[in-house]
Amino acid sequence: ILQDANDVNQRVKLIDILSHDVQRIERLITDYSQILKDEVALSKEKIKKIDLEPIIKSVVDDFNNIHKYKRKIKISYENDKKNKYFINGIENRVEQIIANLLDNAVSFSEDNKEIIVKVSKSKDKQVMVNILDEGIGFKEKDTNKVFKRFYSNRPDKFGQHSGLGLNIVKNLVDLHNATINASNRIDKKGANMEIMFPKV
């Protein structure tokens, strides 16, 4: 293709397109490799009783340090003040779940927006985590298709994506015998990712 392009500007444009395609393929390979590694590693890891709150606070702090000044995106943590939020889980995997969901929320958010991470307990003492953003929300009627491998509903302005991040999250959530649901926010425009961990 480059050989057929005589104009310098056309060559530069083609190189730019090819460069983006290479980056997209690299991300795809990296994400898919992560899935394969996780599927092997998960079978060897042991679940134990852990406190969810400090894990979430740590991830929220890390993301705030990166995005609060860079893009003026504020990430807030809230809870319903029900003391401890214990779950049966693998600490580094729970951290990965929250980080992936926050990364997804940030990538769909414009600058100067807010993302809220809420932790609460249901009446039957399940632990619920909601990650609410102010992005574009979901156009799909079946919102849970976003967890399918290689599925991506990301508009071009938010950059290209492999469509594997939320599938990795779903696999990790399943490992914890938990559930995850995607929906649009009721109070305003944006997405709501809700995880329900079974009571300990």
Model-derived regions: residue spans:
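Short conserved segment of the HATPase_c
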Residues: 138-150
